């Protein structure tokens, strides 16, 4: 999409075999960087955010759906982060969350794309952030069943120790699966490391 739809000149795609990560030392943060924190199918994930410099020129755009509530995220390194608030805790993926850093908001308010943005995707009007969407205003009415389900799940999250508790649970589950796989010679992880 970056090359074919957005036609961003000089785009670099770090292509590696399934289950591997590219060499993160080669990522050019003079440009914007788009990445997935944790691949659901392969299990490949960035180990942490240490590879993202504090003084980067570009913004980071992160799909964190399989990482939020399961991995420790360094929010100071993430400028535009998305995840489905249902899928991340076991529900269907129908509604999304967008978290923007001040740097991302500044870019939205100062950059004018060369093409029209459909109204449903616009986040600025007259070079100012449309902040209502971040205060609970919605474009469409979300399913109240989904909202109630999520509130229920958040109560469960709170009961197991909150965000830290879900990360601990994810790490414990990984340890159990790793121990089991290490005992069976015909099984292995799709992810190399």
Locate predicted features.
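A short secondary-structure junction signal
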Residues: 44-49, 70-76, 92-95, 107-111
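Active-site phosphate-binding strand-loop segment of PLP-dependent enzymes
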Residues: 11-68, 80
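Active-site C-terminal subdomain of aminotransferase-like
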Residues: 86-171, 175
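Membrane helical hairpin/interfacial module
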Residues: 1-9
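Conserved active-site segment immediately N-terminal to the catalytic lysine
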Residues: 61, 75-86, 96
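Conserved small-domain helix->loop->beta segment predominantly found in fold-type I
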Residues: 157, 164-166, 176-193
């Amino acid at each position: 999409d970056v090359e074919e739809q957005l036609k961003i000149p000089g785009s670099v795609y770090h292509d590696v075999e399934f289950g591997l990560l590219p060499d993160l030392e080669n990522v050019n943060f003079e440009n914007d960087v788009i990445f997935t924190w944790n691949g659901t199918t392969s299990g490949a994930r960035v180990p942490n955010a240490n590879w993202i410099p504090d003084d980067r020129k570009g913004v980071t755009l992160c799909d964190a759906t399989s990482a939020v509530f399961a991995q420790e995220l360094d929010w100071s390194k993430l400028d535009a982060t998305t995840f489905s608030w249902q899928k991340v805790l076991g529900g269907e993926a129908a509604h999304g969350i967008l978290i923007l850093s001040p740097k991302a908001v500044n870019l939205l308010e100062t950059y004018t794309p060369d093409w029209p943005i459909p109204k449903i995707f616009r986040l600025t009007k007259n070079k100012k952030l449309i902040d209502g969407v971040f205060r609970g205003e919605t474009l469409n009415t979300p399913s109240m069943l989904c909202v109630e389900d999520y509130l229920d799940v958040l109560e469960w999250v709170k009961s197991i120790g909150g965000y830290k508790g879900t990360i601990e649970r994810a790490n414990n589950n990984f340890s159990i699966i790793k121990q089991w796989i290490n005992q069976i010679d015909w099984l292995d992880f799709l992810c190399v490391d």
